[in-house]
């Protein structure tokens, strides 16, 4: 249509006699009607909108200047071509038309000419040209200044959610975050700008875009706030690193950790760093590296395989007692087994009444040519947690058939497990593509989950019967953002709170199930875990996080729990106060308050417990301790073991030492040990003796007289965990209450409390 309109206008100029009288009458005498029709038809005729998407963002910025420029060119040429005269018949009118965009007009009317006034088409062309110029100038200015405008918004002291590395396959995460984030939070996107469509959508959500190479300066702008006094404060509550290339994501995460190191976190807030690492083995290595560090922020890996596996296990009904059959060896299969192991650990947690539930684990059957290898993978993968917690049934099949598993193989398995859920976790494209549909038709009582190449996400309802066709998805159920393991632990803590604190007659928002719990309360639960994670180093607790679990877990003492409960309460108060809450005394039962008085308090942002720890009173202090102890019991679910912290001590005192000329047996607290020929026999002032290897003796004793040696050097020591076994060159030693574990140059040993007190001094 647009080309037809342009053709008619061109014929009117070049060969007006060829146009029918009816059409030519519409093109002259400055009639408004035809020109309005032309203006309305031309944009549509040119095909610019084309129904190809919403007219927002960068598309709109390109569309309307183009439409206005096309209108100006057509109407300008219509006005100038008949007036070319002695000038070049085409180039002169074209030059005059282009000059309209700069505000210049070639006058050919008046002074006795044939035309008494400017044609209406020319006036409209001038208006369209100037509008296009202005529109383009404003757009260029906004593009050039967008980075500066973004920096100005980042200067505001606001909490923010940061996304690093945006692409088309992670747009679902952006949409979910933008939909669920707190209204007072700021969304910040750091990206190199290669995917302009993704950045345009981020802009449509109001995100601050920091384009260009992702370096230390931009990371600091996005994640930190620098006060005038020079201190750096972490302002990012969540940081998603979503680079599609795994190594890029890991490198960016390390840069972020370096940026956050040394920055402070305001009381009551927590920062979570979530890194997209799709390979389960690399993700586990990432977590293990950070299982021994005490940081001001929480970190975890995100994976499309893990997020999908959680939903697959939920669909399978395994938690409800249904056996699980896993077919194939893949990243998804390994992630499914990891989720089964996690749910087993959760099921073994003590209930609210303190009773550990009986184990009712269902059968897990692995089917495929590499089923035994998958079982070994699962065992290795769960070593950080003390094992998988279940022994799978391995059904090794022949690799001769396509995909390694035939329908007959699965028929044999389902004969023994007729109610099992079958997860076809083979890589898409391997094996019979109709296996899922055949199983669903042959075994209508079985849930069948099939990983297929053309499927997207995990549907809530089956495709047909009990068949679910799934694809990988980073998002959680309901299109919510991906959940890290800290959020899952926070949900368990919330479930315990709901179980131990009966729901009042008029339920409050804080008693809602996790999926309906307001974000404010969800983040408070995560805050609690983050506070406890980073507070184990306070002097009253003096612990740190160990990687592999110790022989025995050191129970939390009442004094440690009380100290952590006080720290958690102070963090809770800071969190609530920063969100506008204030203290208001509760309504005692003697006043016969209305049943919904706590609901009314919540609406007014009043909290009776928003006061100092001392003012809280013994009863609330006790219950805070109960919730804190439960949260501490949850941390081992992520492989974290809190062991006493090591400190550096100086060796002091003088001993008598002689060289052994023959082996000598000796004992420490009833445990037999042995010194070999050539070892040193050391006796302290109290008369106690023990053997020392020559290399250790040379490094830790200095001769000061005949058979007299001064203890020198430093060691690292910590409180012993009762029952743990320490292996030294002299043999194995079982630690007791009050003992100390010492280590130096890779050698560890146990010292009694009295001997340690007399022979070591805390290094200054």
Where are the model-predicted features located?
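Short loop/beta submotifs within extracellular cysteine-rich repeat domains
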Residues: 521, 536, 572-576, 580-581, ...
């Amino acid at each position: 249509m647009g080309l037809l309109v342009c053709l008619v206008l061109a014929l009117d100029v070049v060969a007006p006699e060829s146009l029918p009288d009816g059409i030519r009458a519409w093109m002259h005498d400055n009639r408004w009607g035809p020109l309005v029709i032309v203006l309305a038809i031309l944009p549509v005729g040119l095909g610019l909108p084309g129904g190809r998407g919403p007219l927002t963002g960068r598309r709109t910025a390109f569309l309307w200047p183009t439409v206005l420029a096309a209108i100006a060119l057509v109407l300008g040429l219509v006005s100038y071509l008949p007036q070319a005269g002695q000038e070049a018949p085409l180039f002169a009118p074209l030059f005059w038309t282009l000059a309209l965009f700069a505000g210049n007009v070639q006058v050919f009317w008046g002074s006795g000419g044939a035309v008494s006034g400017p044609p209406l088409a020319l006036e409209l062309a001038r208006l369209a040209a100037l509008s296009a110029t202005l529109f383009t100038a404003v757009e260029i200015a906004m593009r050039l200044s967008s980075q500066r405008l973004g920096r100005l918004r980042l200067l505001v002291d606001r909490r923010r959610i940061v996304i690093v590395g945006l692409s088309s396959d992670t747009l679902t995460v952006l949409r979910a975050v933008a939909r669920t984030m707190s209204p007072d939070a700021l969304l910040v996107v750091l990206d190199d700008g290669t995917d302009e469509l993704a950045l345009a959508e981020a802009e449509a959500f109001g995100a601050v875009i920091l384009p260009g190479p992702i370096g230390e300066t931009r990371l600091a702008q996005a994640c930190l706030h620098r006060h005038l006094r020079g201190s750096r404060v972490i302002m990012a509550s969540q940081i998603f690193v979503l680079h599609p290339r795994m190594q890029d994501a890991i490198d960016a995460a390390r840069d972020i950790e370096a940026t956050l190191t040394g920055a402070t976190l305001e009381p009551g807030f927590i920062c979570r760093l979530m890194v997209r690492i799709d390979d389960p083995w690399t993700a586990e290595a990432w977590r293990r590296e950070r299982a021994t560090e005490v940081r001001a922020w929480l970190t975890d890996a995100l994976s499309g395989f893990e997020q999908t596996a959680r939903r697959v296990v939920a669909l399978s009904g395994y938690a409800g007692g249904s056996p699980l059959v896993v077919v194939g060896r893949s990243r998804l299969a390994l992630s499914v087994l990891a989720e089964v192991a996690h749910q087993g650990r959760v099921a073994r947690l003590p209930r609210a009444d303190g009773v550990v539930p009986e184990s009712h684990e269902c059968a897990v059957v692995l089917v495929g040519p590499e089923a035994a290898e998958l079982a070994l993978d699962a065992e290795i993968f769960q070593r950080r947690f003390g094992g998988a917690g279940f022994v799978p049934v391995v059904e090794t099949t022949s690799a001769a058939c396509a995909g390694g598993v035939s329908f007959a193989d699965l028929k044999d398995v389902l004969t023994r497990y007729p109610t099992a859920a079958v997860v076809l976790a083979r890589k898409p494209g391997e094996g019979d593509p109709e296996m899922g549909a055949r199983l669903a038709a042959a075994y209508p009582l079985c849930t069948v989950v099939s990983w297929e190449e053309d499927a997207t996400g995990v549907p809530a309802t089956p495709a047909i019967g009990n068949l679910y066709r799934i694809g990988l998805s980073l998002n959680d159920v309901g299109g919510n953002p991906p959940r890290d393991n800290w959020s899952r632990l926070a949900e368990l803590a919330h479930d315990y709170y709901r179980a131990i604190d009966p729901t009042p007659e008029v339920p409050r928002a804080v008693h809602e199930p996790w999926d309906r719990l307001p974000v404010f309360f969800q983040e408070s639960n995560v805050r609690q875990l983050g506070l406890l994670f980073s507070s184990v180093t306070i002097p009253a607790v003096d612990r740190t996080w160990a990687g592999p679990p110790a022989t025995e877990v050191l129970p939390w003492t009442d004094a440690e729990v009380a100290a952590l409960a006080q720290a958690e309460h102070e963090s809770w108060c800071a969190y609530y106060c920063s969100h506008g809450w204030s203290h208001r005394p509760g309504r005692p039962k003697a006043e016969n308050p209305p049943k919904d008085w706590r609901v009314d308090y919540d609406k007014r942002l009043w909290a009776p417990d928003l006061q100092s720890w001392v003012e809280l009173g013994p009863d609330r202090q006790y219950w805070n301790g109960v919730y804190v102890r439960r949260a501490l019991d949850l941390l081992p679910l992520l492989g974290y073991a809190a062991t006493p912290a090591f400190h550096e001590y100086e060796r002091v005192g003088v001993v008598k030492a002689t060289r052994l000329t023959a082996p000598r047996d000796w004992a420490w607290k009833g445990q037999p040990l042995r010194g070999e020929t050539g070892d040193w026999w050391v006796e302290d002032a109290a008369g106690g003796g023990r053997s020392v290897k020559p290399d250790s003796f040379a490094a830790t004793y200095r001769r000061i007289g005949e058979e007299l040696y001064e203890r020198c050097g430093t060691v690292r020591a910590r409180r012993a965990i009762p029952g743990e076994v320490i292996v030294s060159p002299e043999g194995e030693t079982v630690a007791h209450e009050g003992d100390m574990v010492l280590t130096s140059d890779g050698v560890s040993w146990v010292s009694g409390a009295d001997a340690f007190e007399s022979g070591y001094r805390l290094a200054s």
